[in-house]
Amino acid sequence: MAIRKFKPYTPGTRQRVVTDFSEITSSKPERSLIVSKHRVKGRNNRGVITCRHRGGGHKRQYRLVDFRRDKRNINAKVAAIHYDPHRNARLALLFYEDGEKRYIIAPAGVKVGQNVISGESVPIEDGNAMPLSVMPLGSSVHCVELYAGRGAQMVRSAGASAQVMAKEGDYVALKLPSTEVRLVRKECYATLGEVGNSEIRNTSLGKAGRRRWLGRRPQVRGSVMNPCDHPHGGGEGKAPIGRAGPVTPWGKPALGLKTRKKNKPSNKLVVRRRRRISKRSRGGRDS
């Protein structure tokens, strides 16, 4: 897979960089694994905006993805690699020997016609799912369960992978993409390899309209609003925010405040916290 650049025929194509979609199969999505999804546009059940800058975009249908990999010791053949409008990662369509069809997150390097399997005594190959207790030290994994049988909850985005660092007692230490080292129960399942479509980080939308197609509305800086709309608003011209530090639209400290609960039960499972991102490398915008 590679990225594709365009000649600057228009201002939108000048900055546009996309993936070439060469790994995606031309077949249509599996109808039995597609359901309609009501889009909430950032509103809750009362119609109140709870997530700003959401709405519009192209109509989507949700693909049912198997995050549990609970069909043990049954070979499955990769029949197709499909696009998923709800995530940057691709989906691999599996045909099991017993006739069942399922979607999984497509690992990097998985080809059409390849066989994958899940279980405790399966080959150490990319795409196979197994408990963390039987994985070799130093191996890269993705789609990691936090609780056995609940399904993968971590390391599911495009290009992501965690590393098996150590095994001790009932726990396995994983180094997550955020550099955090966390303990996970050894009976939890994970998939070998990293998630595919890692080149997505090198792409560029190129124009505001393509962002609207994805359901993202414009983000207005707080410093250009009125005082009644944002704590940064008001003043004559380009006025400073008038506070010791930037805040959210609701007056809470922004950019750097730790939001994790201090008495969270899973704190004892975090061996090393993720490294803190500096303001210069964050590149955040005025909220």
Swiss-Prot record:
- The region called Disordered is annotated at 221-287
On the tree of life, the source organism's domain of life is Bacteria
Task: Name the SUPFAM superfamilies for this protein.
Answer: Nucleic acid-binding proteins, Translation proteins SH3-like domain
Indicate the segments annotated as coiled coil, or none if absent.
none
SMART domains registered for this protein in UniProt: Ribosomal_L2, Ribosomal_L2_C
The keyword Transferase appears for this protein:
no
Which GO annotations describe the biological process of this protein?
A: translation
Asked whether the UniProt record includes RNA-binding among its keywords, one would answer yes
Keywords attached to this Swiss-Prot or TrEMBL record, sorted alphabetically, are: Ribonucleoprotein, Ribosomal protein, RNA-binding, rRNA-binding
GO CC field: large ribosomal subunit
* Disulfide bonding pattern of the chain: none
Q: Matching InterPro entries, A to Z?
A: NA-bd_OB-fold, Rib_uL2_dom2, Ribosomal_uL2, Ribosomal_uL2_bac/org-type, Ribosomal_uL2_C, Ribosomal_uL2_CS, Ribosomal_uL2_dom3, Ribosomal_uL2_RNA-bd_dom
Transmembrane portions of the chain: none
Which GO terms of the molecular function aspect are on file?
A: rRNA binding; structural constituent of ribosome; transferase activity
In which residue ranges is the amino acid composition biased (Basic residues)?
Answer: 258-287
What interactions and quaternary structure are annotated? Answer: Part of the 50S ribosomal subunit. Forms a bridge to the 30S subunit in the 70S ribosome.
> What role does this protein play?
One of the primary rRNA binding proteins. Required for association of the 30S and 50S subunits to form the 70S ribosome, for tRNA binding and peptide bond formation. It has been suggested to have peptidyltransferase activity; this is somewhat controversial. Makes several contacts with the 16S rRNA in the 70S ribosome.
NCBIfam families xref list = rplB_bact
Similarity-based family? Belongs to the universal ribosomal protein uL2 family.
Protein name as catalogued? Large ribosomal subunit protein uL2
